[in-house]
């Protein structure tokens, strides 16, 4: 069962078999709820592609961030090592016990595990947070859903995707705990395209930043983004678009 590892700039070149605290989850967006799961951990075990892209490909789940942004956010939160499971049909058949024994314990040398209360894993989703309690070598921390907002609704990636789809960027940013940023490819000096794998704000006019530069832009269907003023984007280059708020 191959697992790809990435060491953040603040991490260690080699883990040298030392025991670690491992946070496990998809962590799409690395929002405020996810950050509670990360507390006290130095390692993250996550998935790329997102499991739902394999288990339920239609309709396609729209992501809140790409791999690079996820790594950057995790690094800023003090995570030293990130292990990516290349989730596919084969991984979907791995039992919950094999997942714990062969990946969490044997590969990542975990002594502590932190997961959200609704975390499910293993073939057919039979693994739950309680599954980790079967292993005496592991201490398990289960984080309850974090609530935020007038209705005390739980923070979740699903909730944030709905806010983005409605163009409610400010509330999405509030739950993310930081900018809502996506990669985009310049197709002309003032036009960008965001891949359809990502959550795109509702068509409208937004204030934003492109690679840190303040702009106004308009989003359309199919991921097309147009800057409202002439710019000097270099064709076929990838830039980062950070949406700030909806203007119209």
Curated annotation (Swiss-Prot):
It comes from the Bacteria. Gene3D superfamilies: HUPs. Pathway: Cofactor biosynthesis; FAD biosynthesis; FAD from FMN: step 1/1; Cofactor biosynthesis; FMN biosynthesis; FMN from riboflavin (ATP route): step 1/1. GO terms for biological process: FAD biosynthetic process; FMN biosynthetic process; riboflavin biosynthetic process. It catalyses: riboflavin + ATP = FMN + ADP + H(+); FMN + ATP + H(+) = FAD + diphosphate. SUPFAM superfamilies: Nucleotidylyl transferase (SSF52374). The keyword Aminoacyl-tRNA synthetase does not apply. Its EC number is 2.7.1.26, 2.7.7.2. Keywords: ATP-binding, FAD, Flavoprotein, FMN, Kinase, Multifunctional enzyme, Nucleotide-binding, Nucleotidyltransferase, Transferase. It is an enzyme of class 2 (transferase). GO terms for molecular function: ATP binding; FMN adenylyltransferase activity; riboflavin kinase activity. Belongs to the RibF family. Catalyzes the phosphorylation of riboflavin to FMN followed by the adenylation of FMN to FAD. This is Putative bifunctional riboflavin kinase/FMN adenylyltransferase. It comes from Rhodococcus opacus.
């Amino acid at each position: 069962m191959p697992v790809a590892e990435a060491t953040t700039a603040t991490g260690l070149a080699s883990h040298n078999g030392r025991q670690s605290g491992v946070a496990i989850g998809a962590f799409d967006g690395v929002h405020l709820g996810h950050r509670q799961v990360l507390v006290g951990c130095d390692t993250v075990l996550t998935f790329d592609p997102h499991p739902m892209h394999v288990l339920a490909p239609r309709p396609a789940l729209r992501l809140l961030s790409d791999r690079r942004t996820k790594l950057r956010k995790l690094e800023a939160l003090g995570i030293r090592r990130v292990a990516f499971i290349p989730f596919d049909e084969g991984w979907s058949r791995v039992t919950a016990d094999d997942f714990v024994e062969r990946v969490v314990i044997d590969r990542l040398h975990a002594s502590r595990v932190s997961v959200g209360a609704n975390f499910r894993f293993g073939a057919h989703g039979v693994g739950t947070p309680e599954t980790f309690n079967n292993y005496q070598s592991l201490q398990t921390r289960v984080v309850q859903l974090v609530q935020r907002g007038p209705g005390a609704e739980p923070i979740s990636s699903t909730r944030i995707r709905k806010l983005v789809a409605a163009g409610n960027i400010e509330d999405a940013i509030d739950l993310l705990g930081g900018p809502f940023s996506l990669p985009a490819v310049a197709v002309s000096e003032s036009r960008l395209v965001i891949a359809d794998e990502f959550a795109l704000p509702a068509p409208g006019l937004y204030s934003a930043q492109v690679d840190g530069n303040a702009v106004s832009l308009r989003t359309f269907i199919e991921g097309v983004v147009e800057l409202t003023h002439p710019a000097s984007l270099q064709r076929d280059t990838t830039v980062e678009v950070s949406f700030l708020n909806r203007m119209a």
